[in-house]
């Protein structure tokens, strides 16, 4: 072992004089030295019998537990005849005590070649150190994976009067581009994604417990629909036809309601060829639910119950912190029509106004509008600019103009409106729901009007889908539909302020 590569302070050297290339060169040399010494730097398996968290939770001073644990080295304190280091596994961290006289000189010298970031397996027993820390006293250890690239941004922390090197990773853009490093060095990031999984599992169980069927519908579609958005296009070579990545799965799920299912839902990847910001990613996750014989009023109550249960599951209480505000998700939520909301926050009355009058209202409010957009889009612009950001506590915005919602059923008592709601929380839309339009004649009229809007230049207007209309002509029962953006819901319940913080690998500009 005397010809081992020279190490700087026996760990990652944080000094600027040591470049990344120098550190990597040394690690490659260590890898080669290990292999030459007959030590496999990447063995095939290691039998794990315990986790860091389990060892700590089960610790009994009187009955030390024999354990076999594995993880990544996150801190090292090397001394002459004994060393301490911390390993991190999928559920936490635990300290390891390694003594030369117990593991043997050769093994101990091998340990001296290890770095922060290396993955090791340890066999030994649990004990408590003099400082009170539950640890593992190693009897054997094995290198499981040699890390050739140092974890970035070293920092020092004093432990028991000695300096210990830790690593951190703070640059947000680098964190998103190299999520694997982010997960290694920022445990709170891992916690966010664990919570995401719990939220989706709760929703899935909630829907299944009601007897509704989880289904799958096409991602590649010959006609896109179900939302107002620009699609991604692709080409099918064998069929020589243009296809679209779905922007929503609504129209296919409604076909299944026509087919006789009382309730269907799908956790779907949807794609919209639009901008990227804190609340939008071109590829996103959405769950859509359709339940026969129900309406949008019933769906509001379901949403209240579902969000409250998810909040309690993740946070252990009725509320969550989101964008600097404490959000109370205990039902009931406030309900407000879109017209009343605009009246309340701008003083302007939009009911029974012509397109020209709506343009004048927008102008008075200081909005500059695209001359091609129609009445529905004008109302949407006014709401989005002056109302939505002010709706912090959960609020159902209801009863939208017909033009804004071509797939929703006309309001049973308010001419010109439809039975639709959006839930706004923290100034952002979380979900969207309709009493679904099931009259095929009116649906055709609505989609043909959308086609006219496309001719006026609205490239987000929907396309006439003849097969969907044919399905409706067979008869679809009364139905309530719901779409929830999973990414935004996770942001809300975990307190994250960017959609990139709840998606493992968000889309980024090229480096």
From Swiss-Prot:
Q: Where is the sequence biased in composition, kind Basic and acidic residues? A: 1-10
- What PROSITE patterns does the database record attribute to this sequence? AA_TRNA_LIGASE_II
Q: What remark does the entry make about the cofactor?
A: Binds 3 Mg(2+) ions per subunit.
* Name the UniProt record assigns to this protein: Lysine--tRNA ligase
Cofactor(s) this protein requires: Mg(2+)
The record's annotation in HAMAP family points to: Lys_tRNA_synth_class2
Stated EC number for the protein is 6.1.1.6
Q: What organism is the protein native to?
A: Chlorobaculum parvum (strain DSM 263 / NCIMB 8327) (Chlorobium vibrioforme subsp. thiosulfatophilum)
Q: Which family does it belong to?
A: Belongs to the class-II aminoacyl-tRNA synthetase family.
Amino acids binding Mg(2+) 2: 429
């Amino acid at each position: 072992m005397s010809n081992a590569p020279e190490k700087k302070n026996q760990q990652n050297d944080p000094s600027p004089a040591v470049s990344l290339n120098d550190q990597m060169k040394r690690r490659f040399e260590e890898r080669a030295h290990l292999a030459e010494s007959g030590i496999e730097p990447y063995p095939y398996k290691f039998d794990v019998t315990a986790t860091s968290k389990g060892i700590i939770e089960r610790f009994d001073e009187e009955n030390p537990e024999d354990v076999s644990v594995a993880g990544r080295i996150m801190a090292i304190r090397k001394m002459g005849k004994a060393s301490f280091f911390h390993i991190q596994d999928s559920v936490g961290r635990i300290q390891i005590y390694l003594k030369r006289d117990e593991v043997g000189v050769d093994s101990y010298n091998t340990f001296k070649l290890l770095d922060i970031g290396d993955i090791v397996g340890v066999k030994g027993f649990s004990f408590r150190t003099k400082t009170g820390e539950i640890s593992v006293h190693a009897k054997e250890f094995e290198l499981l994976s040699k890390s050739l690239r140092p974890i970035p941004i070293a920092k020092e922390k004093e432990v028991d009067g000695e300096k210990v090197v830790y690593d951190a990773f703070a640059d947000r853009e680098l964190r998103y581009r190299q999520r694997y490093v982010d997960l290694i060095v920022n445990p709170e990031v891992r916690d966010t994604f664990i919570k995401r999984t719990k939220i989706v599992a709760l929703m899935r169980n909630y829907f299944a417990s009601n007897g509704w069927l989880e289904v799958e519908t096409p991602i590649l579609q010959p006609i896109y629909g179900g939302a107002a958005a620009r699609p991604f296009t692709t080409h099918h070579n064998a069929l020589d036809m243009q296809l679209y990545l779905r922007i929503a799965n609504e129209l296919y799920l409604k076909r299944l309601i026509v087919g006789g299912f009382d309730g269907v839902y799908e956790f779907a990847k949807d794609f919209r060829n639009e901008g990227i910001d804190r609340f939008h990613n071109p590829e996103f996750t959405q769950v859509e639910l359709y339940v026969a014989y129900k309406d949008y009023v019933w769906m509001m109550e379901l949403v209240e119950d579902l969000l409250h249960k998810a909040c309690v599951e993740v946070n252990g209480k009725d509320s969550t912190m989101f964008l600097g505000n404490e959000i109370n998700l205990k039902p009931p939520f406030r309900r407000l029509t879109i017209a009343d909301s605009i009246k309340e926050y701008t003083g302007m009355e939009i009911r029974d106004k012509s397109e020209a009058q709506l343009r004048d209202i927008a102008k008075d409010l200081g909005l500059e509008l695209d001359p091609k957009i129609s009445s529905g889009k004008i109302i949407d612009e006014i709401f989005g600019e002056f109302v939505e950001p002010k709706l912090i506590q959960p609020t159902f915005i209801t009863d939208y103009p017909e033009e804004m919602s071509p797939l929703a059923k006309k309001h049973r008592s308010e001419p010109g409106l439809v039975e639709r709601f959006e839930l706004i929380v923290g100034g952002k839309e979380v979900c969207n729901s309709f009493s679904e339009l099931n009259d095929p004649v009116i649906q055709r009229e609505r989609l043909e009007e959308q086609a006219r809007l496309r001719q006026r230049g609205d490239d987000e207007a929907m396309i006439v889908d003849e097969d969907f209309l044919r399905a409706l002509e067979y008869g679809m029962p009364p139905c309530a539909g719901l779409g929830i953006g999973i990414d935004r819901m996770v942001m809300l319940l975990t307190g994250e302020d960017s959609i990139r913080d709840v998606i493992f690998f968000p889309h980024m500009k090229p480096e």
